[in-house]
């Protein structure tokens, strides 16, 4: 895939799209700080982070009243980007204490849903959590250094987790989270289909540098496989991706998840961050232009579930603020596109969500705020900061 822009991995420079589109540095930094405070502070209307005792904390899915590996891994990524080791360690400690599975077919993975008291709702994992845990742990190691005691030996924990993701089931029970032949991430380990929003090639590029040596080629190949997969999973005219898709990219609608809905929103954000970190391509710019064009004539209060060809359902979006955030974050891949600024402005003028469905929206909101302000960074090992 021919790159049309350089990425921050090579330049060590991060675009601040807010600034490029006319916002002042002071108001941008204030907004980032305020967004963090709304999610991790004391405002009961907007907060999603809760502390337990002296050394534990969790992010609550406020709509489902559970704690998910999605949110916990997101929280760790947010904390390392914001330089909050205290909160990172609380979340990781809660995760290891309550979610990590040491026996059974999924030993080495994390239970995807728990109650706030730590009781497991499920003994199965969801791979989008594991991939975010792994990179957040590497970044923590590189930013703060590894701790001497488990589970705060961050880089060792990350490598161990990625080893399990690739090799689970070799010579015993269990399943890998990636199909080892086509290098594509699965929706859950025991099935052979995918979720386009799980594909994070920009993460796998970094895993190919920092994972166990024997798996580095696998991760490099996974990055390329995911970039190619997104081309066939996103609709050629609308740019919309389904929540579940088969390995050939076609929607998997066996259980009603073959349409553009909540999970799908993350695809635009992921493409944007991949372009920011590793450089954009003609395809990534066009893909974001298509998504932004599709929503250009739609009001957020009328966002719906859509077939990927754009046909709307009656059902309204559950997370319109999240969709505004991800479409804006996509602008990192299409900075000069006809809708890039309008999407960033719409996001800037949209407040953090309140109410019981706020968790997912506000996670996507903070990621977009970080990315669009140049604050969603790759944290390199000491000594590699200047290497190209």
Swiss-Prot record:
Keyword Hydrolase recorded: yes
pH dependence: Optimum pH is 6.2-7.3. Stable between pH 5.0 and 9.8 for 30 minutes at 30 degrees Celsius.
The keyword Flavoprotein belongs to this UniProt entry's keyword annotation: no
Outcome, altering residue 263 to A: Activity is 0.02% of wild type. Has glycosynthase activity
Keyword tags: Carbohydrate metabolism, Glycosidase, Hydrolase, Polysaccharide degradation, Xylan degradation
GO biological process: xylan catabolic process
GO MF term (any one): oligosaccharide reducing-end xylanase activity
SUPFAM superfamilies: Six-hairpin glycosidases
Catalytically driven reaction(s): Hydrolysis of (1->4)-beta-D-xylose residues from the reducing end of oligosaccharides
Enzyme class: hydrolase
Active site: residue positions: 70 (proton donor), 263 (proton acceptor)
Reported temperature dependence: Optimum temperature is 50 degrees Celsius. Stable up to 40 degrees Celsius.
Record note on what altering residue 128 to A does: Activity is 0.4% of wild type
UniProt effect for mutating residue 70 to A: Activity is 0.01% of wild type
The protein's Enzyme Commission number: 3.2.1.156
Assigned protein family: Belongs to the glycosyl hydrolase 8 (cellulase D) family.
Role this protein plays: Hydrolyzes xylooligosaccharides with a degree of polymerization of greater than or equal to 3, releasing xylose from the reducing end. Only hydrolyzes the beta anomers of xylooligosaccharides, with inversion of anomeric configuration. Hydrolyzes the glucose and xylose-based trisaccharides where xylose is located at the -1 subsite, GXX, XXG and GXG. Does not hydrolyze xylan, chitosan, lichenan, curdlan or carboxymethylcellulose.
Name assigned to this protein: Reducing end xylose-releasing exo-oligoxylanase
Source taxonomy: Bacteria, Bacillati, Bacillota, Bacilli, Bacillales
């Amino acid at each position: 895939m021919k790159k049309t822009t350089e990425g921050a991995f090579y330049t060590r420079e991060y675009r601040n799209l807010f600034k490029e589109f006319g916002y002042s540095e002071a108001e941008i930094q204030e907004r980032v700080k305020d967004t963090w405070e709304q999610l991790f502070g004391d405002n009961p209307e907007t907060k999603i982070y809760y502390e337990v005792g002296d050394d534990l904390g969790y992010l609550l899915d406020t709509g489902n009243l559970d704690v998910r590996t999605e949110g916990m891994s997101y929280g760790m990524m947010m904390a390392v980007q914001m330089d909050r080791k205290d909160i990172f360690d609380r979340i990781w400690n809660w995760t290891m204490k309550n979610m990590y599975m040491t026996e059974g077919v999924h030993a080495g993975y994390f239970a995807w849903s728990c109650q706030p008291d730590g009781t497991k709702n499920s003994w199965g994992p969801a791979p989008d959590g594991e991939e975010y845990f792994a990179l957040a742990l590497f970044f923590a190691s590189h930013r703060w250094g590894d701790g001497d005691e488990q589970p705060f030996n961050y880089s060792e924990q990350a490598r161990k987790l990625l080893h399990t993701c690739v090799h689970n089931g070799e010579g015993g029970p269990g399943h890998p989270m990636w199909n080892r032949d086509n290098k594509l991430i699965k929706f859950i380990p025991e099935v052979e289909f995918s979720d386009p929003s799980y594909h994070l090639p920009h993460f796998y590029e970094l895993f190919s540098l920092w994972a166990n040596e024997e798996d580095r080629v696998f991760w490099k190949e996974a990055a390329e496989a995911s970039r190619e997969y997104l081309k066939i999973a996103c609709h050629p005219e609308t740019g919309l991706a389904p929540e579940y898709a088969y390995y050939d990219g076609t929607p998997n609608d066996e259980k009603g998840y073959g349409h553009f809905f909540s999970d799908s929103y993350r695809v635009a954000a992921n493409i944007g961050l991949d372009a920011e970190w590793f450089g954009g391509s003609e395809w990534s710019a066009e893909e974001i232009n298509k998504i932004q064009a599709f929503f250009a004539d739609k009001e957020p209060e009328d966002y719906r579930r859509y077939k990927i060809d754009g046909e709307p359902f009656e059902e309204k979006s559950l997370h319109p603020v999240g969709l505004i955030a991800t479409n804006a974050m996509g602008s990192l891949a299409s900075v000069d596109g006809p809708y890039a600024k309008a999407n960033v402005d719409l996001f800037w003028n949209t407040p953090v969500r309140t109410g019981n469905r706020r968790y997912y929206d506000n996670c996507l909101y903070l990621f977009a705020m970080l990315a669009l302000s140049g604050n969603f960074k790759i944290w390199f090992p000491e000594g590699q900061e200047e290497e190209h």
